[in-house]
């Protein structure tokens, strides 16, 4: 959350939360989740930024990636913790932007089918966070003497063995 220096934005924060969660950085997630609670709209969704030149109405893109961040943080975006005083959840806010065609609108005020909004809404409604790949790194291999180094040992920190 960069709100101390800028207005912050929900999208960048969502990707940071998901990356931190994938890397096991759960202690760093609380400020971002508090940021989301502080700017959540009464309908349950989020705008890109508050304040914003785009307005502060809920948009599908920002709501979708925020839902993914909540999921990555191990919370339920349809649960009581994310239900507004008006009784709305992030999931309901996103579902409300789905058109009869099955596609999603960016905002209620711009109801046309929006490809990016649709692409971002689908994994969020499927309950999936952004799919970060992880890799297990094994123990470092024993250092080896390499003739080209004049007999010097290779730095053990560079001698990684991937499994």
Question: What is the predicted function of each stretch?
Answer:
Residues 31-32, 158:
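A general marker of short, structured functional hotspots
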Residues 93, 109-161:
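Terminal, non-catalytic domain-edge segments
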Residues 1-31, 42-87, 99-100, 104-133:
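An alpha-helical repeat/solenoid feature that recognizes helix-turn-helix modules
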Residues 37-41:
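Compact integral membrane and secretory-pathway proteins
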């Amino acid at each position: 959350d960069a709100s101390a220096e800028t207005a912050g934005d929900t999208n960048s924060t969502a990707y940071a939360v998901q990356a931190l969660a994938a890397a096991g950085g759960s202690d760093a997630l609380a400020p971002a989740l508090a940021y989301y609670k502080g700017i959540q709209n009464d309908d349950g969704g989020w705008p890109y930024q508050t304040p914003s030149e785009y307005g502060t109405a809920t948009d599908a893109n920002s709501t979708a990636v925020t839902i993914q961040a909540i999921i990555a943080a191990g919370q339920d975006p349809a649960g009581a913790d994310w239900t507004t005083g008006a009784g709305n959840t992030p999931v309901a806010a996103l579902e409300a932007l789905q058109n009869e065609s099955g596609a999603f609108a960016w905002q209620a005020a711009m109801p046309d089918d929006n490809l990016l909004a649709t692409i971002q809404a689908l994994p969020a409604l499927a309950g999936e966070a952004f799919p970060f790949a992880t890799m297990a790194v094994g123990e470092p291999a024993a250092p080896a003497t390499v003739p080209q180094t004049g007999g010097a040992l290779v730095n053990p920190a560079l001698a990684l063995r991937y499994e």
